[in-house]
Amino acid sequence: MFALKKNEGFDRLLKMIGEQNEKNVDRSEEIEKILNSLKLTMKAWKTDTGIYSIIKYDKTALGLTQDDYASIGLLRSVVVDESGKIVSYSPPKSLNITAERETQFNLNNIMSPIGDDNTNEWDAEEFVEGTMINLFYSEKGNSWEVATKSTVGGNVTFFSPKNPKDTVEIREKDTFRNMFFETCKKVGVNYEEFPKEFMYSFVLQHPKNRIVLPITEEKIYITGLYTINQDTLEVNQLNRAGFIKNYCANAVLTPKPLFSVDYTVAGFKKEFASMNSPYNLMGVVFNNMITGERMKVRNPNYELVKNAKGTENKMMLQYLSLRHGGRVAEYLKSFPEYKTDYSVYRNSVHAFTKNLHQNYLDCFVFKKKPFAEFPQQYKKYMIQLNKKYIEELRENRNCVTFNYVMEFVNKIEPGALLFSLNYVVREHKTVIQRLEEPIEKVIDTATDTVEVKATTEETATATATDEPTPIEKEKEKEKEKQE
């Protein structure tokens, strides 16, 4: 249950909105004062079903802290009608995973494949890519209405058309509103049968609204289902599975549940949100089934592809070149406006270094899986590290430590390092290009790729097998003692 009155003055704000609209009393000054004090924004929208206001927390507000999100984060996207009544509610903002919250995760209180909703406090599910569409019933308009996070009516598009001449046509045909209702019809969702007192939050996937993933078919996921007590302003979260079973089985999807080997946050991150995770995993979302709290971890590879731009490569190469020469701090003294961007690039290099070291250990020391199964962008350097171990470190009984890998990465030529850091971006572009190619061309290209990949991995595997196992190392030490 979400207590919206936790935001002191929010109930008064709703009352002021109602008085201004229905009694024609000017409350704009008082409304603005409450919005500012609560760090909220509000925008009015007029549709065929009525006049609405979307209230959201202001991400740009001065002095906004993570602690504030526990209260104003409940107001991520709230739609109010002209009487001040809440008609639509979206899932609240996800909270940061703090050290205290991280201790809550273990096999005893997070859903496992054999877990029970009644005995586990948390569950983990895939972070679904798409556009949030909230559905609610308008009593005044006597029909169903939709809202996105920032608009009511959904008569907007996300991507601008490449051809300006197509603007009007595309806005009319490919709005979020049209795509949502067309998808409902295609997958067999009869929303006219839905309970009108519920507020619904969905994620829409549509081929015409591609964000990162190569979406080829329309899908609708339900992420939130709510009722509200208009007097107490308490929002109740309802069971999604039960709703689907009764009203839209085989039509509306729920995010896929995720399971980890050790059921810790670190375990989930490693499997679903690390530099080793494929870019087509957006991340993982943790849901508290008692309080309704949400926490999420984003996959850095997904974010890398999402934020990739033409000018981004030039800036990143510039950073890597300065870093290679030890001149980053000096450069930022003259151009401090690049500090934020450079921090992002630095974190990418650090994550790459950490994963390269772990992949080396998992492959050549712990033998967790075959060399061929490791991410392509690390293989070249894993082989080089193994070679250095054999030729330089083994004789002195030294091993490949994290500091050794850090120094190794610092010496990689900037262009080569950029190539590896951007591997998932190029992989994504290839997938998208193939979606748009004729099928005959895709088959020919795929055949050539398989042949080249097979040859490359055979060579790489042959090199990799030169690395001794831990048992072989112990035998070697015993042999040296005997001599």
Regions from the PLM with identified roles:
Residues 1-483:
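Core nucleotide-handling region used for phosphoryl-transfer chemistry
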